[in-house]
């Protein structure tokens, strides 16, 4: 695609992003960070941009920042709950389905910059893509304005869903499977990435679950995390049937 087309898309994004942040009641300093946070690898590939200009590094950072923020929230809100309960609650809040709820609620899914092919194949509604962009946005917000502003954002966008019990139907199969295995004294659970295929903008990951030294189930997904969730779901359902 042409430089002019890229410029038009970027300018349109920046205007929409500015409007969105105003609606949410937040300011920002470095628009480039947020543009990167919403740049999917397919968009970068379409315009032959630097491969590190997509949002995966910010997603990595945002994942850690989000876990810290939610951990602090749960630690303060539930002073009498043991570590195990807090871990389970955190897993539910930061899992993919929950992040999709948060992103869609405020329209962040509409901000994602996608390549032409990804857009045509329904990438904008793909849960893993939306949750990744949400984590990348958190990473950008942290770098741009610090942890205090991330906390304020979470108070407005994340914590209300938790306090209104809107995440009760969300299932984090990795946590659910881990707890079941622990209850049954079946040993430790590990995950291995066994296959990664497809073009850079449309990867397909396959992961396996290892229990007691044996691979007991596999799962596929558009991200490594999604493939592990699907593998855990399969393993959990298998063991429940066996019992």
Swiss-Prot record:
* Protein's GO biological process: mRNA processing; regulation of gene expression; RNA processing; rRNA processing; tRNA processing
Which of this chain's residues are annotated to bind Mg(2+)?
A: 59, 132, 135
Top-level EC class as recorded in UniProt: hydrolase
Region (Disordered) residue spans: 219-243
Q: Which cofactor does it need?
A: Mg(2+)
Quote one Gene Ontology molecular function term. metal ion binding
List compositional bias (Basic and acidic residues) regions by residue number.
219-231
Q: Assembly and partners?
A: Homodimer.
Q: What does this protein do?
A: Digests double-stranded RNA. Involved in the processing of primary rRNA transcript to yield the immediate precursors to the large and small rRNAs (23S and 16S). Processes some mRNAs, and tRNAs when they are encoded in the rRNA operon. Processes pre-crRNA and tracrRNA of type II CRISPR loci if present in the organism.
**What name does UniProt use for this protein?**
Ribonuclease 3
């Amino acid at each position: 695609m042409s430089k002019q087309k890229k410029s038009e898309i970027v300018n349109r994004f920046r205007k929409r992003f500015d409007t969105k942040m105003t609606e949410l009641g937040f300011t920002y300093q470095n628009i480039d960070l947020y543009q990167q946070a919403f740049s999917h690898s397919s968009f970068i590939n379409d315009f032959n941009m630097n491969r590190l200009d997509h949002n995966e590094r910010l997603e990595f950072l945002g994942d850690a920042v989000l876990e810290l923020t939610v951990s602090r929230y749960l630690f303060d809100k539930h002073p009498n709950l043991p570590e195990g309960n807090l871990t389970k609650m955190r897993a539910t809040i930061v899992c993919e389905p929950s992040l999709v709820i948060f992103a869609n609620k405020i329209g962040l899914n509409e901000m994602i910059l996608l390549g032409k092919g990804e857009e045509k194949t329904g990438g904008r509604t793909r849960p893993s893509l939306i949750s990744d962009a949400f984590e990348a946005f958190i990473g950008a917000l942290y770098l741009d304005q610090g942890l205090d502003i991330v906390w304020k954002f979470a108070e407005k966008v994340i914590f209300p869903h938790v306090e209104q019990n809107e995440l009760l139907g969300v299932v984090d199969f990795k946590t659910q499977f881990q707890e079941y295995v622990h209850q049954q004294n079946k040993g430790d659970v590990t995950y291995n990435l066994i296959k990664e295929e497809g073009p850079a903008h449309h990867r397909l990951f396959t992961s396996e679950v290892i229990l007691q030294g044996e691979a007991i189930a596999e799962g596929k997904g558009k991200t490594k995390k999604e493939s592990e969730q699907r593998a855990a779901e399969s393993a959990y359902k298998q063991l429940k049937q066996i019992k």
